[in-house]
Amino acid sequence: MAASALYACTKCTQRYPFEELSQGQQLCKECRIAHPIVKCTYCRSEFQQESKTNTICKKCAQNVKQFGTPKPCQYCNIIAAFIGTKCQRCTNSEKKYGPPQTCEQCKQQCAFDRKEEGRRKVDGKLLCWLCTLSYKRVLQKTKEQRKSLGSSHSNSSSSSLTEKDQHHPKHHHHHHHHHHRHSSSHHKISNLSPEEEQGLWKQSHKSSATIQNETPKKKPKLESKPSNGDSSSINQSADSGGTDNFVLISQLKEEVMSLKRLLQQRDQTILEKDKKLTELKADFQYQESNLRTKMNSMEKAHKETVEQLQAKNRELLKQVAALSKGKKFDKSGSILTSP
């Protein structure tokens, strides 16, 4: 037998059979595990992860160095708005296709009508970028499942046909030998009585029935053996499950980062409010102390004025009493001196 052709992995350049390499980037199983395809935490586009700590694509890393951390886009809510309030994808789509419309899947106003060419790929639905990616991923998975089922069915049918071909010559030879025996012994059977002929027919019918019962017992063994297509499909499904897990982990990391940012923003707002409250309390206490000092000074001044007025009133009363007494003395003296 000729040796099967080997193909090089695009990452480690080691040679493997074609079935062991991935369909898209022709990577081996070890490279797929070491460098999985994950989604960027900012722009949500898929890229090959160089290290486990790297969760941002090269383009977003350059933009972070140049413009700083991005903000969420006002249309798609993806944290990729490095310049302004819109991400680069939404700005380009708005220039090309007009204002955004509501997505039929996520109900957000972030879907751009790409006319017939774009809708033809998603069965005539108006979807945003993230929803189109998820829809295409589901379609790809269903196609792969159908292919794996078809390959397993074809391999099982081909193996059963080869097994039948192996048994067919023996059966033909047995049938030819049986026919020769039947033709040679036909002359002998013709000389037998009808009862003996009936017994011979029963024996031949039993032997043929035993042969028919023995042949199907061998088929389940062949069907129980897994074909190469099934094993490769199982490996592909396991690899796709691993990539899905990495995607889920990156999504969870993104959610954790967004929640941390929200917590930081809320903490900052709480600190600012606390500062304002302390400033207002200090101002209130200062104003209250000033008012109290003013009230005390006014009360003291009022008491002093009241005391002064009371003292003056007393003096005036004394003067009035003295004047009234002097008048009385003057009147009595004038009465005594008169004849």
Curated annotation (Swiss-Prot):
Protein name per the record: Protein FAM76B
Ranges where the record places region Disordered: 144-243
The keyword Translocase belongs to this UniProt entry's keyword annotation: no
GO cellular component annotations of the record: nuclear speck
Phosphothreonine, modified sites: T215
Coiled coil: 248-328
Modified residues (Phosphoserine): S22, S148, S193
